[in-house]
């Protein structure tokens, strides 16, 4: 594979003239560097990898030692081979003393520039430089290189035989590398291209490939070191080839020159042409570093010489990185490969030695060959890995240290791998030098056991005095062996830091023991699903917490620079005595590293606001950080644990017995966030843990005093109560007291369980519903009350019983009367019922209703009715709605409201929405506004229509009082229907200022249509801002120019008359063709022919004595002129073809002009209507739809009818397009035949008749097209009128009459349905608003595009007019040139000799042909302009019609949308039938939107088809242009032929002057013919015309570019229109919710 790639690279370079072979040496990715930029290490892994220096030209600027150089002994002459035997060689001198003539050896390796090439050159064969004399070129590289190729570029022919040698190393012998010879066998004894076989690849090959003498100069020879070597594809595995490509010096031995064989004649000139000359000696390769360096650098050696060496990596050294550094001998040195870097590895001496050697045997056994010597630190071994005797190595250290074992307490002086000595029984210590804890009496026999109890010993470590054996006990433990609790404590345990737990018993006993049936447990919060009722609190109060799902934590944040605490939920509160001496554990992290700790970071709050607190860092806990950390706090009274205040154990447990809050500080800096998770509080319970059923031995069982009972003496004995009511378990118990009405009481509250209809804590009063004195202590103390519903009563001083709590609506001593605001008669058995006044009465007022009938008497809030349920006349609203006061004044505007009666002061309105009954064209809730486009509301008859002109006004609105429309700039009139004074050009953009020049105008008023100002005499221009032709000084009254300009003016007038006459003549020929039968013309031709014959005979007579030269040259001139005339005829044909193309373009432009202009007017009106009337009407319809709920079937029918009209118009547009295409085809054919008529000859009359007939057909087609367009316009007007009627119907829609009482009954049933439907409607409205905005934007874009089309069309019209004029002038000019050339031919047939006169004729002829060339150039320019114009007009009639159709469809859809809005917005007052109708309308709307999208797709396809038609037209125009280009080439060729004729004439021999005089008359006639052509005078006119054309074309291109952008914008808008409604809901289901 490698060989194939090399051959391919070599072939490519050879064909490109760069025959260097491609690099074959394996390399790494040049961008593959390590993190430090070192390519010898992988960027990502930092692992070593093979690296090589850059591929360079190793010979560049190196000195080449040569054995022969020309010009060194003396200047020598040499001749350059030409390659042609008949051509003389160019000889030069080589002189080494002068730089410009020397060719030294340094030129072999210098920088060569293509246009300034340097070379080395040997002496020539003249100086004896030929076989067997050999010339050697020796290049010393300075160090070894891996060579890819050696390249030589010869200035002389390449040698016939030469050899390339190399030295592998500096001290090695020269060995042949490659032989080149055309005679391999004879010269070197080798076969040509002998095959190289595996196993013998380091063999030089001989080839004759580059030994040919051709090329004479510039020959290349490229030797690739690996070409043809079988193992080249496995280069890295072949040590033979690696050595083969290595070279430290290269020698080129030039043995024999290539010659043509002519040296045998010993001609010095020939011998000097044979020599060796080489311009470039290049050696491609890399500095050899064996894959261990990426660059070579200069280095000073021992002898001070600067040499090239590798900058070695991979722990290697040497000039070629060919050996390992000292101490890097763990494996043998190898060169790096693409697979393995083979870096040298350091010996593993455990950092205890810096000397090692490579041990081959060790390498074979272990794979590591580094053998360490001189180990330090009490070590030994191959890797210094062993300690010497009685020493050991500490973990993480290399050195070994002495064991130091105590001889009394140790069994041996050698320690183990951890440095521990082997101790005797009871002995401990690293060196076995002390007794174990719990042991004493250190001796040679070891130590004795003290017998300490582990659970009672300090820190659970049995420890005693080493002399006496006394044990060290925990705080609450006593005894010599620490085996019992102190009095008042229980539960001796190893898990208790203090040994025993204090007896609490609520202070009622000090004797207790361990209770059975309790197990250890945790109260936990893990926050795996929510925040588990944890709250937050700061100095202000409670704060909300957040659940952090990812962290499984609860979070709080600091917002006011005050600490925020996590507050534990209820499960952590209450009686937590079992948590004493247990741990509170949680995980905490914060958002900021800054922490400000406090002594109140952890707070436990007990009863009566008692607190226990500590710092977050107490008990060795860390500062909170952004990393989650676990915190553990022991709940214990000992000062060691840091709880404040410092109180005794019983008081501490007393706080735990009724915990009201546990607070954990969460934030420690401003705007900090704290995260709490995994909260656990150690406690005990009766339910064992399934995972770890551990006995809870710290739960007490107390021995109680009399009056107390319970496990903890927490309750009073039966018959006893708390000394203080609800005094709690700490309170003492005393006997009960119940005034003889009970024998028992509740222990905590002290309340008696009363009997005898008594109540109270001590039965001191009568129960509810009873009266009497309970303190008497008898059973009859309390009697029953005579009140309704067993209500309470009191005994009055007069002895009567009075009921104190009558039912609502009742009053009186026995509750037997109705209260104010109620009606009924309790005494007759009629209940008291609250008066129903709908909340429209004053609750503080008395007598709001009749107490018997319930009729409301004092209605407020502008209401009336039996129940105050309706608004008063002249008011509207809902009298029942909350809050009250909804009845508002109608406030109808009198001038705009209909009066149903003669009461002018009271104008009623609809009580549901407040809408007044408006006069025609009046709108507003209070009928106080004119509708959009109307005015004069004060008339009392309604509003009058503004009737603003759609073109001249900014919209359809006008002043509501005067009716004045808002006019566009420059427009005036109440209706904005005419241009203001001093303005013109009434259009959709307003009117433009006349801007008449004050000096040149009679006044400032201009023509209202064209804008032409009334100019003073001799002044012209639209603005009257310039003088007439040949006049100057407008400020001075346009004075006439001087006489010289008068003469020029006269000549210009003459020329114009001639051109006009010529145009008239041409037009006469076209209109009145006749057969060419001019007898006088024929006679004149015959007379001229006879004269020419006579002259010719005279010439022959003069030259009869042997002057055949003139005759021959004259005949040649004649033949050349005939050929020129034939080519001119071809030019005529090309011009005719170009004219056909130009006429076709002209017809297309005219057709587009007519169609676009008609469509522009129609669409401009439609667009203006959409922008003004359409948008305003749509807004009015939308407002109406907000008020009314009924749908208009008439609107749907009108919209459907409008769509049918649009389809009809589309069909008619298609017919118009077909007729237009037929008209174009007829016009094109007519134009072609007219062109043929100009050059047609005798058939003109017949063809003119046919043209007239086709012209009539064309006129008929045009009339039909116009008729259809007019019909289409009428249809569009009808559609617009129909849309206007539709909008009027929308305005006329009125709300139906609704019965308020019936509506009130229905509201409750459909209220929920209405709310859902309103939400859906609002969403639908929002979605449709976006569509409405899209419609408006589309309309605006269409308007802009049509305006651009209009401007472009105007420019195109003018351009086509100028094109037609240019074409006529070109035809005239070509005809004149043809006639002139024919006259020249007749004159040249008799020419014999020429003198001074002929020189003048020649100059005139040159000028004539220059004019012809200018005409041709103008023709080419016109064709280019035509081509550009046709390319710039991609929009044709159908395209514009399609856009109009799109605008019509969008208008219809806008009206339909307005209808749909009415059907949707306030449908909450409709029933389910209305809802279904709305759903149906929405589906219809979706179908219409889908149809709209399909229409847009159809229009897009039509536009693409039109674009293809335009492209075809451009292609035809391009063919016409190519024909014109060929005609231009023909004219240029003819010009060259004429110049040749003139040159031939110049070289003719002189003749007698007398003979020239005889021809002078003929020459004068020729001059007159040339002058009549006057082509030179037409050139400036054509040049100016061309400049004008260029300006117009540039403007046209700019307009077309803008138009195309607008088209793309419209297409993008169309593509973005939604194809369907995505918010489809089932309104019936929504209504049932």
Curated annotation (Swiss-Prot):
It comes from the Eukaryota. GO terms for cellular component: basement membrane. The keyword Disulfide bond applies. Disruption phenotype: RNAi-mediated knockdown in L4 larval stage, causes ectopic membrane extensions from body wall muscles. Transmembrane segments: none annotated. Residues 1-19 form the signal peptide. Disulfide bonds join 287-296, 289-310, 312-321, 324-344, 347-356, 349-372, 375-384, 387-400, 403-415, 405-421, 423-432, 435-447, 450-464, 452-471, 473-482, 485-500, 736-745, 738-752, 754-763, 766-782, 785-803, 806-815, 818-832, 835-849, 837-856, 859-868, 871-887, 890-909, 892-916, 918-927, 930-943, 946-958, 948-965, 967-976, 979-991, 994-1006, 996-1013, 1015-1024, 1027-1038. The keyword Repeat applies. Residues 287-346, 347-402, 403-449, 450-502, 503-512, 702-747, 752-784, 785-834, 835-889, 890-945, 946-993, 994-1040 form the Laminin EGF-like domain. Pfam families: EGF_laminin, EGF_LMN_ATRN, Laminin_B, Laminin_N. Residues 529-701 form the Laminin IV type A domain. Keywords: Disulfide bond, Glycoprotein, Laminin EGF-like domain, Repeat, Signal. Glycans are attached at residues 116, 136, 348, 522, 658, 740, 936, 1077, 1183, 1226, 1259, 1336, 1452, 1528. GO terms for biological process: animal organ morphogenesis; axon guidance; positive regulation of locomotion; tissue development. Residues 47-286 form the Laminin N-terminal domain. PROSITE patterns: EGF_1 (PS00022), EGF_2 (PS01186), EGF_LAM_1 (PS01248), EGF_LAM_2 (PS50027), LAMININ_IVA (PS51115), LAMININ_NTER (PS51117). During the formation of neuromuscular junctions at the larval stage, negatively regulates membrane protrusion from body wall muscles, probably downstream of the integrin complex formed by pat-2 and pat-3. This is Laminin-like protein lam-2. It comes from Caenorhabditis elegans. The gene is lam-2.
